[in-house]
Amino acid sequence: MTLVHSNFAEIDAILDSLGIPAVDGMLFDLGVSSPQLDDASRGFSYMADAPLDMRMDKDDALTAGEVVNTWPQGELRRILYDYGEERYAPQIAAAICRAREKAPVETTLELVDIIRSAMPAQALREKQHPAKRSFQAIRIAVNDELGAVSRMMQAAVGRLNPGGRLAVITFHSLEDRIVKSEMQQAARGCTCPPEFPVCVCGKKPLVKLVTRKPIVSGPAELEENPRARSAKLRVAEKL
């Protein structure tokens, strides 16, 4: 076994460095790991006070503090909406910018208070923590998570032997959407318009879908590991 400290988006370079042209299987377990979430000092949690970090790899330069304190209001609004699916994105982005004009936003709980202040009373009464979506959005931006998933998916199929399988576990809908789309595209083959009588693009399917619908956790798994409640597994096999 060889352990490699790298981003899975670099799967081509990783395999090249190991002298491995192709493999019989790949399993990608996306998202933040439990040890990262449970270590309050990493800044992923909205339940404990810590510096605004959120880097999965501490060697990376961009931190949540830089995003919160330096990115333009419009860009903050975009990531909150696109990556967090936060309906109060405009209000939260504006509140962050007002707060940082007075003093830098330095900790997770400072950010939580700013987010709370921007949301209406009814939203604060919802079961979900008011900062959950915003923290997800900032974390995704810090780590370029969706870009990494896209690059990994586009590279991984090409490094599988015939009959090799690609299995990907996602933990939120944005990741799953990318994985589903990339697998379907690889399984589709021809991309000619439907009105064409014969194929002229020459594209052939690269994989077959092993799972038409994602596999989700059962009751026994959820009892043992509640964090698996949002996990989805999709599998494709190289042709």
Regions found by a protein language model. Name each.
Residues 1-239:
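S-adenosyl-L-methionine-dependent methyltransferase catalytic core, i.e., the SAM/SAH-binding region
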